[in-house]
Amino acid sequence: MTIKEIQEEIVDEFSMFDDWMQRYEYIIDLGKNLPIIKEEFKTEENTIKGCQSKVWLQGEMKNEEIIFTADSDAILTKGIIAILIRTFSNQKPAAILEANTHFIDEIGLKEHLSATRANGLVSMIKQIKMYALAFNAKN
């Protein structure tokens, strides 16, 4: 699937819920299925700066696509990074760099987060794009 198709799928899923309490529960459930980063990669280098919670993100290239794994010490944040990994993992670096993140606004996520969590979301996206930039430069 393309990034755009995945984003559209996520928007459709979020539109099924009537209120934000249900959406928060769904985000938390998504976090339970997060591809967890190996303990050896839970380093300061892989910590996303600007997040209220501890968030680790690691990316590696396989078959010309970036595979992301992550973890967080907060259940809601774990769900947020799970949404981003679902969107951007198994994609080519150039596709990640070209992708927009308007779907975040479409599902209303940023406006329903505290200011510090919203800043953390921006930091997570920025870190994913940095991985894509680095891997794209290597190719």
List each model region and its residues.
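N-terminal intrinsically disordered, cationic/polar leader segments
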Residues: 3-54, 61-66, 104-139
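Alpha-helical support elements that line or immediately flank enzyme active sites
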Residues: 81-92
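Short Cys/His-based metal-binding microdomains
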Residues: 77-79
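Extended, non-catalytic structural segments that build the interaction scaffolds
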Residues: 68-70
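Glycine-rich phosphate/pyrophosphate-binding loops
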Residues: 90-107
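Short, hydrophobic/aromatic-rich beta-strand segments within well-structured domains
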Residues: 56-58, 83
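A short interface-forming secondary-structure element
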Residues: 72-74
